[in-house]
């Protein structure tokens, strides 16, 4: 259910883009993200930081897109969010000395520090590459290509990278945890 709530605003954005335009889709994205946030709060009585940051970014950049009637803002949102995620991962590892990935998954998994560091760094690089790819697609290709890339391309890349991360984790798990 949680994954569906995270993905729902993206589906709404895509549908409204196909039915109307980028501006109606941006407004629908704001509303859908807010509703998903409210529903999550009432169902789980908890909002994850990443979810809250994403909502705030959608609210700010979606509103700027509507107020200035300029799709550059909603296009930049993707890169800024990915860059913030990458920075959070890098700061957690390099400054705070405990990878964010380990903080998120360390209660369920026991892995060597080297594995946590590699996984954390891999996700940071992944987010940076996705942010750069978004810049390229958003500013050098037609808007319709960017929307498809945002909805399907980045989602597929994230799913594949998550699966690869799962394989990497499994290969380094202690035998007793694999059961």
Curated annotation (Swiss-Prot):
It is found in: Cell inner membrane. It comes from the Bacteria. The lineage of its organism: Bacteria, Pseudomonadati, Pseudomonadota, Gammaproteobacteria, Enterobacterales. Plays a role in cell envelope biogenesis, maintenance of cell envelope integrity and membrane homeostasis. Keywords: Cell inner membrane, Cell membrane, Membrane, Transmembrane, Transmembrane helix. HAMAP family: YciB. The chain crosses the membrane at residues 22-42, 50-70, 76-96, 121-141, 149-169. Disulfide bonds: none annotated. This is Inner membrane-spanning protein YciB. Belongs to the YciB family. GO terms for cellular component: plasma membrane. It is a multi-pass membrane protein. The keyword Transmembrane helix applies.
């Amino acid at each position: 259910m949680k994954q569906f709530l995270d993905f729902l605003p993206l589906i709404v954005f895509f549908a409204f883009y196909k039915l109307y335009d980028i501006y109606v889709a941006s407004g629908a994205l704001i509303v859908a993200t807010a509703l998903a946030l409210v529903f999550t709060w009432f169902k789980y009585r908890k909002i994850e930081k990443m979810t809250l940051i994403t909502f705030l970014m959608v609210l700010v950049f979606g509103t700027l897109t509507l107020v200035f009637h300029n799709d550059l803002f909603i296009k930049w949102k993707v890169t800024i969010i990915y860059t913030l995620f990458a920075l959070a991962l890098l700061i957690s590892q390099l400054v705070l000395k405990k990878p964010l990935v380990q903080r998120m998954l360390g209660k369920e998994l026991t892995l060597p520090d080297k594995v946590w560091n590699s996984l954390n760094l891999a996700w940071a690089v992944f987010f940076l590459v996705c942010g750069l790819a978004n810049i390229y697609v958003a500013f050098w290709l037609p808007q319709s290509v960017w929307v498809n890339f945002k909805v399907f391309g980045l989602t597929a890349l994230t799913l594949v990278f998550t699966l690869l991360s799962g394989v990497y984790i499994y290969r380094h798990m202690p035998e007793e945890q694999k059961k």
